[in-house]
Curated annotation (Swiss-Prot):
Function: Core subunit of the mitochondrial membrane respiratory chain NADH dehydrogenase (Complex I) which catalyzes electron transfer from NADH through the respiratory chain, using ubiquinone as an electron acceptor. Essential for the catalytic activity and assembly of complex I.
Protein name per Swiss-Prot or TrEMBL: NADH-ubiquinone oxidoreductase chain 2
Organism the protein comes from: Symphalangus syndactylus
Record GO cellular component, one term: mitochondrial inner membrane
Gene Ontology biological process terms in this record: mitochondrial electron transport, NADH to ubiquinone; mitochondrial respiratory chain complex I assembly
TM region(s), chain numbering: 1-21, 25-45, 55-75, 96-116, 123-143, 145-165, 178-198, 199-219, 237-257, 274-294, 324-344
A GO MF label: NADH dehydrogenase (ubiquinone) activity
Keywords: Electron transport, Membrane, Mitochondrion, Mitochondrion inner membrane, NAD, Respiratory chain, Translocase, Transmembrane, Transmembrane helix, Transport, Ubiquinone
Source taxon at top rank: Eukaryota
InterPro entries with a match to the protein in the record: Complex_I_Subunit_2, NADH_DH_su2_C, NADH_UbQ_OxRdtase_chain2, ND/Mrp_TM
Subunit and partners: Core subunit of respiratory chain NADH dehydrogenase (Complex I) which is composed of 45 different subunits. Interacts with TMEM242.
Amino acid sequence: MNPLAQPIIYSTIFAGTLITASSSHWFLAWVGLEMNMLAFIPVLTKKMNPRSTEAAIKYFLVQATASMILMMAILSNNLLSGQWTTTNITNQYSSLMILTALAMKLGMAPFHFWVPEVTQGTTLTSGLLLLTWQKLAPISIMYQIFPVMNVNILLTFSILSIMVGSWGGLNQTQLRKILAYSSITHVGWMTAVLPYNPNITIFNLTIYIVLTTTAFLALNLNSSTTTLLLSRSWNKLTWLLPLIPSTLLSLGGLPPLTGFLPKWLVIEELTKNGTLIIPTIMAIVTLINLYFYMRLIYSTSITLFPTSNNVKMKWQFENMKPTLLLPTLTILTTLLLPIAPLTFPAP
């Protein structure tokens, strides 16, 4: 990528997300989504190779299809209601089409097929942006229209996403695909509570971005893209060994780490609203996530001293620049749950 073009591309991505999130007019929201999509394609092809080109084409085809469905729903709703306001959806078919288009853009099941492939075909930094920043615009639209959404359809998408994200990561050895399936699961948790308490959705999204950013930065620093490369962490950067397992366990929602807090709030809110079966299913399926995270941790731990081969130690020769971002994110990833009672008002 041309260094001169990078500020233009990233500023366009930021502007597109900001326009969509702050707009109450359907056309402006749609324009923001299109700006975001078109500017993100060069980010996916940062390294020009057939795999990244394939990932960019898949991303474009899915996002363009979702945009066409969204525009069709917007126009049909405008013909029936005469309004362009995002919160004024009078036709249930338009509501269903809008929800379907947003689910495609978020990569929710059953429209999830593109997320692991696109994430695998790009770099770790581009994959981080795909799984974090690119979620903001569609979720901001969902946040605005949640009072008029079909709750049953949304919960169906959410439960399917949690199940597919958990089962899909079981047979993976590529870390980017595992994090992509983890993203599908987390999006399911975010949207499941949206009709009942959208503020918990925003909190869940914030925690998810912190956890995923920590995981991607650690893997990028370690140059690990597969389970095999992750198992050689001892020979490269020894100080990452406690960081990566704690981050993965937090992503899985294991107490007392930070990742347990949003799941706890979602289950509590769903239980308050009388939906006991749904949070039970969600909690049980999440154990599958913990299983394949534990498998990654096991593959890393068995290479610790003295069982590892210490003949070729690389960490003595690594000249790493110190950074404050990763330690700060690690603290937020692991230690936010103990201070959670301080953030909620007393009953």
